[in-house]
């Protein structure tokens, strides 16, 4: 980014973002940076407690991951974003299907501020997930509503809906059963027409999520095939720009917040995502580092040597929540401070002032362009007109609200 000869001052306490569209009855004021989805079971009890306690100290939110809400989330007392994945853990029937009654019971908790439907994640889009039986304790099994002694699988896709229109109906169902709390979904961008089909469903039904979390292919996990981690899913910048364009093109952007996640590790990383179209960011990797993660690559073995990604009590005791919660709090505070200083140095007075042209990229040894020149940015409603931009025309024509399949088979 380029600095200004007339720098501005930003107050760190002003870095809040309101989430909740026209149909939301309980809007939430979120921090600019929050903890991205990581499940209890994948993470240790002490890790979850430290993360949530740090979130409480710093007044930011903690995404539960798809593993459900544990007593360690409650002990921390921090705001929760309850993530619901394809396994419907903590809100499932015995056959693994979604239970609206169990969902309503959990969603009514005051600590739950928002609900996020997980469609896919950047580390392994289209693959599903697994909690090895070695990491499954009786407590985790009770929280998730699964039997002991076997791997816990999250299917690649959802059973509660199978089309874009049904996804919107599911969003509406969760909104009603939660008492009007913000409802959104998370995805890593894959086939463009599929997200455009969701946009068509929003436009046709008038049902819109309150937020969409865009995860980049850079996102990580300790339990994903390397081929998926390295090769599948749109990178965050391209995915973020596309989602912003699609929502803008269908004139939906004004009612929907975009959350960016995927290797957000620095103040500049946050500024970059905001300039490209995000309203706020989530981070998992940086938060794990604050907990003491040394990237030992043992996440899926239950032998994490620093007690972050294990249910082994002997190893878990090496992580002291009373110490690590302060580190989580300090990380968040210092990253937001860095954001304020960078934006102030640019001469801007608010994060909302960031635009793609503020972000510069070297193209060659002799050429620099800003992101407004490198990428196309659509005008509001441009995908609803007869003269659809050429770069989007084929994908829009192939998208249908009644199916994720292409119109052109």
Go through each PLM region and give its residues.
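Glycine-rich phosphate/ribose-binding loops and adjacent secondary-structure elements
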Residues: 153-316
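General secondary-structure edge motif
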Residues: 15, 22, 31, 35, ...
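N-terminal capping/small domains of soluble enzymes
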Residues: 1-153, 166, 326, 330, ...
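Active-site or pore-adjacent capping/gating segments
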Residues: 292-356
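Flexible domain-boundary/linker segments
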Residues: 72, 229, 260, 290, ...
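Alpha-helix boundary/interfacial micro-motifs
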Residues: 76, 102, 135-137, 205, ...
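Short flexible/disordered coil segments
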Residues: 125-149, 183, 242-252, 275-281, ...
């Amino acid at each position: 980014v380029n600095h200004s000869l007339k720098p501005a001052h930003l107050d760190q306490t002003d870095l809040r973002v309101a989430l909740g569209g026209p149909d939301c009855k309980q809007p939430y004021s979120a921090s600019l940076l929050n903890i991205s989805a990581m499940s209890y079971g994948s993470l240790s009890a002490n890790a979850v407690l430290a993360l949530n306690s740090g979130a409480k100290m710093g007044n930011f939110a903690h995404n539960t991951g798809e593993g459900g809400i544990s007593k360690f989330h409650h002990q921390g007392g921090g705001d929760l974003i309850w993530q619901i994945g394809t396994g419907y853990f903590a809100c499932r029937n015995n056959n693994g299907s979604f239970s609206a009654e169990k969902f309503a019971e959990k969603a009514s908790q005051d600590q739950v501020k928002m609900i996020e439907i997980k469609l896919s994640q950047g580390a392994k889009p289209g693959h599903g997930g697994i909690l090895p039986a070695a990491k499954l304790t009786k407590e985790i099994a009770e929280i998730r509503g699964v039997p002991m002694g076997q791997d816990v699988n999250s299917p690649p896709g959802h059973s509660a809906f199978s089309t874009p229109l049904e996804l919107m109906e599911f969003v509406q169902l969760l909104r009603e059963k939660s008492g009007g709390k913000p409802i959104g979904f998370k995805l890593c961008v894959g086939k463009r027409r599929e997200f455009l089909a969701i946009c068509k469903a929003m436009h046709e039904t008038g049902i819109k999520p309150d937020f969409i979390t865009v995860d980049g292919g850079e996102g990580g996990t300790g339990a994903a095939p390397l081929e998926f981690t390295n090769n599948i899913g749109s990178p965050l910048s391209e995915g973020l720009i596309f989602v912003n364009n699609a929502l803008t093109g269908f004139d939906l952007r004004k009612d929907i917040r975009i959350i960016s996640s995927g290797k957000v590790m620095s103040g500049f990383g946050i500024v970059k995502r905001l300039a490209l179209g995000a309203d706020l960011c989530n981070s998992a990797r940086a938060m794990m580092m604050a907990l003491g993660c040394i990237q030992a690559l043992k996440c899926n073995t239950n032998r994490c040597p620093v007690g972050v990604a294990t249910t082994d009590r002997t190893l878990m005791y090496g992580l002291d929540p009373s110490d690590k919660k302060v580190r989580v709090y300090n990380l968040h505070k210092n990253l937001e401070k860095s954001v304020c200083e960078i934006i102030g140095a640019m001469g801007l007075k608010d994060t909302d002032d960031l635009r793609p042209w503020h972000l510069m990229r070297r193209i060659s040894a002799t050429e620099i362009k800003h992101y407004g020149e490198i990428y196309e940015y659509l005008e509001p409603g441009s995908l609803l007109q007869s003269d659809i931009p050429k770069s989007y025309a084929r994908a829009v024509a192939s998208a249908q609200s009644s199916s994720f399949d292409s119109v052109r088979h």
